[in-house]
Design a protein with these regions (language model features):
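Extended amphipathic alpha-helical interaction segments
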Residues: 1-186, 193-196, 215-216
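C-terminal non-catalytic accessory extensions
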Residues: 206-209
Length: 216
């Protein structure tokens, strides 16, 4: 990321919501909490709320994280490694470790909230759970119908994909707009409405609503 920023200083880097969630899940698995995540609805919902912090205004992320962390440790205090999970998310995505000295001062997180925050996109009605590249990769998987295609199948698949992309490009320059799949359009609208309620309800209620919509 640093090398990219140095090469393209005016570019704005925005992380993907899908990969933010995957990062949290990988840590859950690493800490041996996979079974609990799969079987305990309350724990699973709280874990998903961590990624839902991406829909909180950047300036409010740290405070919202503290509220969520307090709720998690209070509601499920007996879960082993829960503090490690929260510390991982805090130091990786919210803020670094507390600095010595008076007052509450923290070092920078590995990934500043600016880099993974999704709120502006949701407010503008372009909320996504995956990015464009992720969608293209999924399209290729559907096209090949296998994980390891033969060379000829791979070439024919690329030719077919090129034809589809060329047709889509021609439709775009002639003003023809392909409609979104209805269920995804409805989901984006629901996320946009939910984001609009921020500040009108308790932050935990807000995070749970976003977390639910992200996995329906």
């Amino acid at each position: 990321m640093g090398a990219f920023t140095a090469r393209f200083p005016s570019a704005r880097i925005t992380g993907c919501y899908f990969h933010l969630g995957q990062s949290v899940i990988r840590k859950v698995n690493e800490l041996g909490l996979k079974t609990l995540y799969e079987t305990d609805d309350a724990f699973r919902g709280n874990v998903r709320c961590l990624a839902a912090l991406s829909h909180v205004p950047v300036e409010d992320v740290a405070e919202a994280f503290e509220i969520l962390a307090d709720d998690i440790t209070t509601s499920i205090p007996a879960v082993e490694h829960i503090d490690e999970l929260l510390s991982y998310f805090e130091h990786t995505y919210v803020r670094g470790r507390r600095l010595r000295g008076r007052g509450e001062r923290y070092g920078p997180a590995i990934f500043h909230p600016d880099s993974w925050n999704q709120r502006n996109g949701a407010v503008d009605g372009i909320a996504r759970t995956t990015n464009i590249v992720e969608g293209w990769h999924h399209g290729l998987q559907v096209l090949f119908q296998c994980s390891h295609p033969t060379m000829w199948r791979f070439i024919r698949g690329l030719e077919s994909d090129c034809a589809q992309q060329r047709a889509s490009f021609m439709q775009g320059i002639t003003g023809i707009i392909q409609p979104s799949v209805r269920k995804y359009q409805r989901l984006r609208e629901r996320v946009t409405r939910a984001v609009g309620t921020y500040g009108q309800t308790h932050v935990l209620t807000y995070l749970r609503a976003i977390a639910h919509l992200s996995y329906v």
